Amino acid sequence: VPQQVYILSRDQIERANAQTAADLLTTDGLLTVQKSQQGGGSPMIRGFESSRVLLVMDNVKMNNLIYRAGHLQNIITVDPSILERVEVLYGPSSVSYGSDALGGVVAFRSKNPVLGDGGKTLFSGNAFMRYGSAN
């Protein structure tokens, strides 16, 4: 079944320098995020609220229609700095993802971990900085 898919690559995610996954997804207008407390939000695709939009992290469902209808705040729990890519599938994806994906799917893929090779000590890190002003 053909459908519209938008993919955010690792480079696009890093260049966006978003503070939350909600900010990341609204930067390019991929979907609407209904803002709530602490910068979180409920994703909305084509008028479907978050209970009808499936959120998936590494092929594991983050929300489930059984638990609650209405606004869900699961999108704030994803840190953009751990993401390798994000796929936004618009429209019904019930065939591939089940009945929870009536409005669409937001599929997050995390980066692969860096593992040591035996006796060597492995140390790495990264940093990013942002500046903001109210004026």
Where are these regions (language model features)?
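Gram-negative outer-membrane beta-barrel proteins
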Residues: L65, S133-N135
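Acidic, small-polar-rich N-terminal luminal/periplasmic segments of exported/outer-membrane proteins
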Residues: V1-K120
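Transmembrane beta-barrel strands of outer-membrane/channel proteins
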Residues: A127-S133
